[in-house]
């Protein structure tokens, strides 16, 4: 994945992912599980429901150590079945 993030970020740094997906109970656990694989830590993601309650947005901040870690997490979070968008 070619991005300009590498030019914009200085590692290590805090990096927040906003994951939007279906409002299913397992969404948050799946997001944390993927993040734990690449950036182990103690996470307390923030969850906000959509106005109609069909979707949830999950915000989770990691301590990113390199651009490959950031890009891999974008890809793996986007591949989760419940996820619709990763910002």
Swiss-Prot record:
SUPFAM superfamilies: YbeD/HP0495-like. InterPro entries: UPF0250_YbeD-like, YbeD-like_sf. It comes from the Bacteria. One of its GO terms (cellular component) is cytosol. HAMAP family: UPF0250. Belongs to the UPF0250 family. This is UPF0250 protein plu1293. It comes from Photorhabdus laumondii subsp. laumondii (strain DSM 15139 / CIP 105565 / TT01). The lineage of its organism: Bacteria, Pseudomonadati, Pseudomonadota, Gammaproteobacteria, Enterobacterales.
